[in-house]
Amino acid sequence: NVYLARLAIDNDKDKAIFEATKIIKSFGLSNRLSHFPSELSGGELQRIAISRALINKPEIILADEPTGSLDQSTAKEVFKILYKLKSKNRLIIYATHNRLFANMADCKLEMIDGNIKPSNARK
């Protein structure tokens, strides 16, 4: 699944396998490679979806509740990966209800009573 997302970009099978293996390991999914989607948990499916989105190294990442289906521990790991990507000059825009993750943002907007307002940003 992740491999095909990479293969669609440059048609280099060896590179696609290498990149897919690397990102799958980073999301802790190495032991799930031979499983069908119906055999995976919601959190595992969410991590695969994120892996597919990230494998081609987009400059801009737009994510709506990227950790919504994940337990707190796995969610923290996903945000660590996203934070590392940010340091590689990638723009990451995400919506979240999780205050901890919202506070990790450099710039934050909040919706209060149906109105979008700027909020305190991290320095």
Language-model features and meaning:
Residues 76-87:
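Helical segment within the ABC ATPase nucleotide-binding domain
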Residues 3, 14-31:
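Conserved ABC ATPase "signature" region
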Residues 90-95:
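Conserved H-loop
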Residues 36-40, 44-46:
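Conserved ABC ATPase signature
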Residues 72-74:
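Helix N-cap at the start of a conserved alpha-helix in ABC-type nucleotide-binding domains
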Residues 61-64:
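Catalytic Walker B motif of ABC-type/P-loop ATPase nucleotide-binding domains
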Residues 35, 55-56, 88:
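Conserved signature/switch motifs of ABC ATPase nucleotide-binding domains
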